[in-house]
A protein has these predicted regions:
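Structured interaction and signal-relay segments at domain junctions
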Residues: 1-62
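Juxtadomain coupling helices with adjacent low-complexity linkers
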Residues: 1-5, 33-39, 48, 82, ...
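Short amphipathic alpha-helical interaction segments
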Residues: 61-65, 94-97
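A short beta-strand signature within small-molecule sensing/ligand-binding domains used
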Residues: 62-74
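Short hydrophobic/glycine-rich mini-motifs in sensory/regulatory modules
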Residues: 73-83
């Protein structure tokens, strides 16, 4: 749904691996480990948003495609993973709508886990 509405690739991760993807080859990303940078972001319950001054984040090990927006999935005070809006074929600064879609998706998944 996020890929269809936003038009950019989406990845959903648990605390270790990519568990779902849309808009990019699933064989390319499923079961790949997340990077240490993403682990730290999730542990700190931080958010990553690419801007003109903030570069995209390397979120998935061994993948050249980087993440433009990352929100952690939090439920009951624990972090269960993250939702990432990945780069498309071109460099792209995410819009407010795209940022909000990722934020809502992460919040929704967190609520579903409670």
């Amino acid at each position: 749904m996020l890929h269809k509405n936003g038009g950019l690739p989406i990845a959903i991760m648990d605390n270790d691996h990519v568990i779902a993807a849309s808009g990019m080859s699933k064989r390319e990303v499923l079961e790949r480990r997340i990077t240490k940078n993403l682990e730290e972001l999730m542990e700190n319950r931080s958010v990553h948003i690419t801007t003109r001054d903030v570069p995209p984040m390397n979120a998935i090990e061994g993948l050249q495609r980087k993440a433009n927006v990352v929100y952690p999935i939090v439920y009951g005070g624990d972090v269960a993973g993250a939702v990432a809006l990945m780069q498309g074929d071109e460099n792209h600064i995410p819009t407010e709508t795209e940022i909000k879609l990722v934020q809502v998706a992460a919040a929704f998944l967190g609520k579903q886990m409670e």
